[in-house]
Every structure is written in structure tokens, then in C-alpha cells.
């Protein structure tokens, strides 16, 4: 996870967080390095009302269907490139 995190934190869009793995433009990020970790990542994001982002390796996109992700949950890669936008309500 250190290699992934070190790549992710280099992005200007990512900041550190004590509560989450990181923050993407102020929203929670949970890292899922494999498809086996996706379920746990969803559970963690439910603590943020389900709104946030899952960060995964770009190569994992072939292993699962991003359309199966909740609309409240976005997807970013190891370089913090947006792969699927989260539908976050306006405040």
C-alpha cells in the first residue's frame, strides 16, 4: 500500500487525513488495492454517508465493472485521475 499511497499523495488534488486514507478535493478517499478490498471500502465510505472516492490501480479497471459502484461513490486511480465521478449533493 505504501507504493500506491506515495503515488497518490503526489497529486495536488489529494491531501492527508487522520480519519481517511486521504482526501480528494476535500472528500474521503478509501484505498482498495484489489477487487477483494472493494466491499470493505464501501463499508468505510458508508461512515461518510456513502459519499467519497475509492482509489485503486488503473489496471484494476479490467477486473471489475465501475458501473456497479454506487452513484455516490467515485473512482480515482493511483495518480488521482478521476475515473468515475461521485454524485455528491450540493450543500
Question: How should these model regions be labeled?
Answer:
Residues 9-13, 28-35, 85-87:
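Short low-complexity stretches enriched in small and charged residues
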Residues 7, 45-48, 67:
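Alpha-helix C-cap/termination motif
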Residues 1-25:
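Acidic-basic catalytic patches of nuclease active cores, encompassing PD-(D/E)XK
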Residues 18-45, 52:
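Conserved catalytic cores of phosphodiester-cleaving nucleases, focusing on short active-site segments
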Residues 48-51, 71:
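Short glycine-/polar-rich loops that comprise or flank the Walker A/P-loop
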Residues 54-58:
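Short beta-strand/turn micro-motifs composed of small residues
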Residues 59-91:
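Domain-level recognition of nuclease-like catalytic cores that cleave nucleotide substrates
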